[in-house]
Amino acid sequence: NLLEEETKMKKNSLQELGWALGVMLLPVLYAVWVYETLPENLSIHFDLSGKGNAFLPKFLVVSAFPIVMMLLEVMIYWTTIAKDILNRTFKHLIRWIFPFTFVSLYLATIYRGLNEEFDIRKTAAMVVALVFIIVGNYLPKKVQADRELINRKWAYLFVLLGFITFIVSIFYL
């Protein structure tokens, strides 16, 4: 019975991985659709003023970059299967935060290639703020069998930094 339950959990994990990879493919379809209108080189890194300071050919951004990100997602899934995570909600959060972060930042990168006036800093800051808030929410909880609880003050600090970053990104960027 324990073997059946473990097999079912792995099957569910593989289905969830398939959904996550599918979500990660959606912005790639958009990038393929607008491929001809993209500039030859796309910014993949930006300085604090929002200007691109590292570039890749659009072919690599549209094709190779998503493949690398999907491989990282597979590694995240493998890690959450191999390592015993006690909190199921946290396990799903770890599995889905990367695809949604990728989708947000990838779409922002593609849109920035189409519109130089688009301020990518706002999108990046909002994603970082949400990650801080989520991590702060789960820091004080015991999520792995072999780990100790982390002091709640760190969790409060992460949540506070997340809210401040989010407010700054909305009103000041």
Identify the residue ranges that each predicted region occupies.
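Short, Lys/Arg-enriched N-terminal segments with co-localized hydrophobic residues
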Residues: 1-8
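Feature 926 captures the class I aminoacyl-tRNA synthetase adenylation module centered on the KMSKS loop
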Residues: 10-42, 47-49, 55-173
